[in-house]
């Protein structure tokens, strides 16, 4: 939402504690994102490039990964409140709005709020909507969730195929 047109993508997300994430986009174009602690690699096979960089030091950017992995106390990174208008998700559970903390100057904040919907029986995250200050909304819906499947560390290691250009990204930090 908020973009000139709605962009849809699908894929598979893998998480492992502590601080490991792999996101394989399948549609519309294949991409792979790897996160290990503060290191990020984004591989775009179509362009034969991998972008290598660091997560920002802003709490608003690190907290979603910690949230997905259950590593952080929500109160450390967010002010929790019911979603506006008392909206409810599937099963009647209230949606939760998370307002980022830790950004001293509001002008530097890129995320206005994150809205969460949890599955009624398991309390596993079902939907995460990231509302940006500029009005854009990125909504992630999780289906076919499997927990404690014993993912191997190698799944989160990326080695660029031969001929792939490695590009060092600028540090994603406030000016």
What is each residue range found by the language model?
Residues 1, 24-26, 43-45, 99-101, ...:
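A generic structural motif
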Residues 1-3, 14:
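A short, Trp-centered hydrophobic/proline-enriched beta-strand micro-motif
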Residues 4-6, 121:
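Edge/loop elements at the starts and ends of beta-strands within beta-rich repeat scaffolds
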Residues 7-9, 17, 27, 74, ...:
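Residues that act as N-cap/strand-start positions at coil-to-secondary-structure junctions
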Residues 12-63, 138-139:
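An acidic-aromatic
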Residues 59-75:
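Short, solvent-exposed helix-to-loop capping segments enriched in aromatics
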Residues 73-163, 167-168:
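Gly/Pro-enriched, hydrophobic low-complexity segments
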Residues 173-175:
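Short, solvent-exposed mixed-charge patches
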């Amino acid at each position: 939402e908020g973009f000139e047109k709605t962009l849809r993508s699908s894929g598979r997300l893998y998480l492992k504690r502590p601080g490991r994430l792999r996101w394989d986009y399948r549609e519309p174009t294949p991409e792979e994102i790897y996160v290990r602690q503060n290191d990020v690699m984004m591989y775009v096979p179509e362009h034969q490039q991998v972008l290598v960089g660091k997560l920002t030091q802003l709490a608003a950017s690190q907290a979603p990964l910690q949230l997905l992995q259950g590593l952080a106390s929500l109160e450390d990174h967010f002010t929790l409140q019911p979603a506006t208008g008392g909206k409810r998700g599937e099963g009647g559970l209230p949606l939760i709005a998370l307002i980022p903390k830790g950004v001293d100057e509001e002008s530097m904040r890129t995320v206005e709020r994150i809205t969460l919907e949890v599955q009624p029986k398991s309390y596993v995250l079902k939907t995460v909507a990231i509302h940006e200050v500029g009005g854009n909304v990125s909504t992630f819906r999780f289906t076919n969730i499997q927990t404690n499947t014993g993912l191997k560390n190698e799944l989160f290691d990326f080695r660029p195929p031969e001929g792939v250009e490695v590009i060092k990204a600028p540090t994603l930090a406030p000016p």
